[in-house]
Design a protein with these regions (language model features):
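Short, small-residue-biased leader/transition segments that mark boundaries at the very start
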Residues: 1-6
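Non-catalytic extracellular/periplasmic "stalk"
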Residues: 9-79
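Intrinsically disordered, low-complexity boundary segments flanking structured domains
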Residues: 18-22, 84-90, 128-130
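A generic alpha-helix structural signal
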Residues: 58, 81, 152-155
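Long amphipathic N-terminal alpha/beta scaffold segment
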Residues: 62-105, 110
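Core FKBP-type peptidyl-prolyl cis-trans isomerase
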Residues: 90-200
Length: 201
C-alpha cells in the first residue's frame, strides 16, 4: 500500500469518526464531504455563504443541536426516574435522589465533613460504564462534601459496611454542563457504592 493511499485512508477514517460525534445526528454526511472537497479545491462557485456566514451557521447549528440532545436526555432521565421509584426496594429522598439497599452495614454513618473510603462503579442509564474504582483495583478516598450533591447526600445515609445502588438526577450530578465525553448534559447517573470506612485523619 502506497503512502498516498495510507494518508487517504487514515484521514478518511478520522473524518468518519469525527462526523459520528456531531450532536443531533442530523448532519448529511454527503453534503459535508462535498463541502470539504469544494473548500480544499478553492471552488467557491457553488458556495452560498462566505466564510464568516458559514462559521456563524455552524455555531448556531451546534448550539441548537446540543440543546435538542440535552432536552432529549432530560426527558429520558425523567421518565426513567418516574418508573424506577415505583420499583420494589427503591427509596426516593426529598431531593429526588433514589437508592436501593443491597447490603446494610452496621458501622457509623459519615458526616459531610468526613473523609471516606469507597468502592464504586458509575454507569449511564444505557449501561455505559464511565468510572470504576473496582476496575482500577483500588478504593477511592475523598471528602463527603467534596463530590457531587447526590454523592454527598447518599454517603450520609450509608452505615460503614453497606452496599447501595444510587440513581442520581442530573441536578444532583453534573446538571446541564455534563462531564467529559461520556456524561452528557442532563444525564441521570447510576452508582453502585460500597462504603468501606470513614478515614480518620
Amino acid at each position: 500500500m502506497g503512502s498516498e493511499m495510507c494518508i487517504r485512508d487514515s484521514t478518511g477514517a478520522g473524518y468518519k469518526e469525527n462526523l459520528k460525534t456531531l450532536p443531533g445526528g442530523e448532519a448529511n454526511v454527503d453534503d459535508l464531504i462535498a463541502g470539504f472537497i469544494q473548500a480544499i479545491k478553492g471552488d467557491s462557485s457553488a458556495m452560498k455563504m462566505n466564510p464568516q456566514q458559514a462559521q456563524q451557521y455552524l455555531q448556531t447549528y451546534f448550539v441548537e443541536a446540543q440543546a435538542r440532545e440535552a432536552k432529549k436526555t432530560k426527558e429520558e432521565g425523567d421518565k426513567f426516574l418516574a418508573e424506577n421509584k415505583t420499583k420494589e426496594g427503591v427509596i426516593t429522598t426529598e431531593s429526588g435522589l433514589q437508592y436501593k439497599v443491597e447490603k446494610e452495614g452496621t458501622g457509623a454513618k459519615p458526616t459531610a465533613t468526613d473523609k471516606v473510603k469507597v468502592h464504586y462503579t458509575g454507569t449511564l442509564l444505557d449501561g455505559t460504564k464511565f468510572d470504576s474504582s473496582v476496575d482500577r483495583g483500588e478504593p477511592a478516598e475523598f471528602g463527603v462534601g467534596q463530590v457531587i450533591k447526590g454523592w454527598t447526600e447518599g454517603l450520609q445515609i450509608m452505615p460503614v459496611g453497606s452496599k447501595y445502588i444510587f440513581w442520581i438526577p442530573a441536578e444532583l450530578a453534573y446538571g446541564e454542563r455534563g462531564a467529559g465525553q461520556d456524561i452528557k448534559p442532563n444525564s441521570v447517573l447510576k452508582f453502585e457504592v460500597e462504603l468501606l470506612d470513614i478515614v480518620k485523619e
